[in-house]
Amino acid sequence: MDSLSIVILAAGKGKRMYSSLPKVLHPIGGEPMLARVIRTARALNPSRLVVVYGHGGEQVRARIQDADIVWAEQAEQLGTGHALKMALPHLPQDGKTLVLYGDVPLTKASTLQRLEQAAAGGMAVLTDVLADASGYGRMVRGADGKLQAIVEHKDCTPEQLAIREINTGMMALPNARLADWLSALNNGNAQGEYYLTDVLELAVKDGVAVESASVDASWEAAGVNNKVQLAELERILQANQARALLEAGVTLADPARIDIRGELKHGMDVSIDIGCVFEGAVELGDQVEIGAHCVLKNVKIASGTRIAPFSHLEDAVVGAECRIGPYARLRPGAELAGHVHIGNFVEVKKSKIGEGSKVNHLSYVGDAEIGRKVNVGAGSVTCNYDGVNKFKTIIGDNVFVGSGTLMVAPVKLERDSTIGAGSVISKDTPAGELTVARARQVTVPGWKRPQKKSG
């Protein structure tokens, strides 16, 4: 089999995005458009992957740091043919080259494989048929149905404007012919650019077989030139991902109200309520329930756990049969064993919480290690930061922490101890004992509140 090279054209400025961010770095599905195109390209196992960059090149290369990518600069944006010419020195003289676009993010790998296969005897172009082909290059065929040329919209005759089959821009080309064809391009057109599409006519003149492959859906070939189009493709992507979840057995309260900005793995009988956002790598075990308006980023949740509405979890691990929220926040480094309860307005960061422990109300747990079957009362805080350094709180098994307790780290509460409500614990507490650290209650007879002066 011929070796396959892939060239991704990503040099455009994107004026209509009205942004200092290069167009190909605008996100879709939680990652830059260019990153998504690269990921799709890799599914074809190319021997070489070249990205042609131009506008905002430093930003693009800083964001996409894959070591195996070959970078080719197009200092002046003189058209797609000129862009591919910039990649030519990096391509082998044999095999095929697949040309993709950094602002066309939703093309499926299976479609590109069909395009590659169609070019087995020469070159191939990926096409689509649109009800309204305005703005697109038209596929001009002869009486025998064979492709003869691609004519850009601005250069079309009235008869050609009636053609509905359009060029998506993606094509597969024989490397042995590339240098000659690209050198033969001229910019004698309405745009004054070197069109890659003119290669098709050169191929026909040279007697090279030109075939076509079609997309399965028009959104596969849809490009992004402005924020409206980006938003439209984002919704299409999210709808596709939601449908895939439904087909795999996940229950979605409303498929139109879920956003997946990364990879979501799941077990059986998972249910997700409305308005949830999944970012990065998220893994949900069997029978996990996610309540409305939760945000999960890089988390792993074991089977049977329920996340109540409006909870935020990031870089956290949650054990089986836990109850989280509502309005709970698990920050990076939170590790919960099984059957843990984290209630409303509780924040946990860089802490391990043991089997069956509960932190149910209005509390902060940071830089802590909590044992099994611990109860942390409402309004309790691990005071872990002195303004410069952070310190650890250790709570042993079966400790009961009364409401409103401040634990000033570094401090250790030994197993089976009880802490009286309202205590400020700054020293280690002994096992199995009651510790109370608060001022004695005092009543001042006859005390009066200060009064505001009248007038």
Curated annotation (Swiss-Prot):
Q: Which Pfam families match?
A: Hexapep_2 (PF14602), NTP_transf_3 (PF12804)
Q: GO CC terms for this protein?
A: cytoplasm; membrane
Just give the chief location class. cytoplasm
Give one GO molecular function term. UDP-N-acetylglucosamine diphosphorylase activity
Annotated catalysed reactions: alpha-D-glucosamine 1-phosphate + acetyl-CoA = N-acetyl-alpha-D-glucosamine 1-phosphate + CoA + H(+); N-acetyl-alpha-D-glucosamine 1-phosphate + UTP + H(+) = UDP-N-acetyl-alpha-D-glucosamine + diphosphate
Active site located where? 361 (proton acceptor)
Q: Recite the UniProt keywords alphabetically.
A: Acyltransferase, Cell shape, Cell wall biogenesis/degradation, Cytoplasm, Magnesium, Metal-binding, Multifunctional enzyme, Nucleotidyltransferase, Peptidoglycan synthesis, Repeat, Transferase
Q: What does this protein do?
A: Catalyzes the last two sequential reactions in the de novo biosynthetic pathway for UDP-N-acetylglucosamine (UDP-GlcNAc). The C-terminal domain catalyzes the transfer of acetyl group from acetyl coenzyme A to glucosamine-1-phosphate (GlcN-1-P) to produce N-acetylglucosamine-1-phosphate (GlcNAc-1-P), which is converted into UDP-GlcNAc by the transfer of uridine 5-monophosphate (from uridine 5-triphosphate), a reaction catalyzed by the N-terminal domain.
Cross-referenced HAMAP family, in alphabetical order?
GlmU
Checking NCBIfam families in the record gives: glmU (TIGR01173)
Name of this protein: Bifunctional protein GlmU
Biological source species = Chromobacterium violaceum (strain ATCC 12472 / DSM 30191 / JCM 1249 / CCUG 213 / NBRC 12614 / NCIMB 9131 / NCTC 9757 / MK)
State the gene name recorded for this protein: glmU
